[in-house]
Amino acid sequence: MEWEIEFTDEFNVWWEGLSEAEQDSVAVKIGLLRAHGPNLGRPTVDTVRGSRHANMKELRVQHAGEPYRVLFCFDPRRAAILLAGGNKTGNDRWYEEFVPFADRIYDEYLEEIRTKGLIP
């Protein structure tokens, strides 16, 4: 079974700013997420601390020796929603900056699918 993967506009903006090589590295990990879904664990996926959402995870990508992260959640329909990404090299505050950002994006996403009647 393949798991559904969706992405937000914010993720897409980040993705479009990546080089082709960076996109390839991230795409490999997204492919693993598509294949294994919520069963994918460390070292590829880890739980994010400090999120308002207990199901907030990070996709852990290494590219050219640098750590990239994609924050995502499985929504109530069990689709993986890619929220935001970034290269955390040299940024000790990456999680402090990106987790609240991803929380806001996911809140807005949930409201949108609720309004469309896709979830109760």
Q: Model-found features: residue ranges?
A:
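Basic, Lys/Arg-enriched alpha-helical interface segments
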Residues: 1-67, 76-80, 87-120
